[in-house]
Amino acid sequence: MKTFLIDYRRPDGREDFKVVEADTAAQAVEIFRAAGCDGWSGFLFQEFDIMAVSERVG
């Protein structure tokens, strides 16, 4: 499993993100859509390293 970060814009204009665990980018997008986010605009960041970011943040 890989960790994917999806940065997206909600229909009301607010920006948000979702972290998804999946084997492939295509599966991550399907999980995102199945969560009720189909049709929302967004960007997919592959293999996001959460541990590296949390260590840098604090």
Question: What does each model-identified segment do?
Answer:
Residues I6, V19-V20, I50-V53:
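Hydrophobic aliphatic residue packing
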Residues A35-G58:
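Short, mixed-charge low-complexity intrinsically disordered segments
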Residues R14-T24:
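A short, exposed loop/beta-hairpin motif centered on an aromatic-Gly-Thr core
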Residues M1-E15:
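Short aromatic-glycine-(Arg/Gly/Cys) micro-motifs in beta-strand/loop hairpins
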Residues I31-F32:
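Short, composition-biased linear "edge" segments at structural boundaries
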